Amino acid sequence: MWQEFKKFAVRGNVIDLAVGVIIGGAFGKIVSSLVNDIIMPLVGLILGGIDFSGLSWKVGEAEVKYGAFLQTVVDFLVIAFSIFLFVKLLNNLHERIKKQEETKQTAPTMTKEQQLLTEIRDLLKQQKETP
């Protein structure tokens, strides 16, 4: 069982996934800071100095913190848009590489007429070279 686990854990896909999760977590922190420390204060300033983190409703004893929810929604939208742009960039790069490979692989094929003309040219060259 230990051998199976080692084989599973060392495979490239698992390691790639782990790296992706770690980078994703770090990216999430960066985006959260961007939203909480830059975007939302600017939006609050534009809307008249509102601090979104403190917005809430009192319903009896409960406090509904809709300001924090709004920040989380903006956080999600920024992350989703960033991922969209990244995936779009990767797709464009993939298409470019694919087109380059296709153009390399599709060597121009000569028609019968072109083949005959090439043979005639080569024969004429041979005749000129031999006295």
From Swiss-Prot:
The keyword Cell membrane applies. The keyword Transport applies. It comes from the Bacteria. It is a multi-pass membrane protein. InterPro entries: Mechanosensitive_channel_CS, MS_channel, MSC/AndL, MscL_channel. Channel that opens in response to stretch forces in the membrane lipid bilayer. May participate in the regulation of osmotic pressure changes within the cell. Belongs to the MscL family. This is Large-conductance mechanosensitive channel. It comes from Anoxybacillus flavithermus (strain DSM 21510 / WK1). The lineage of its organism: Bacteria, Bacillati, Bacillota, Bacilli, Bacillales.
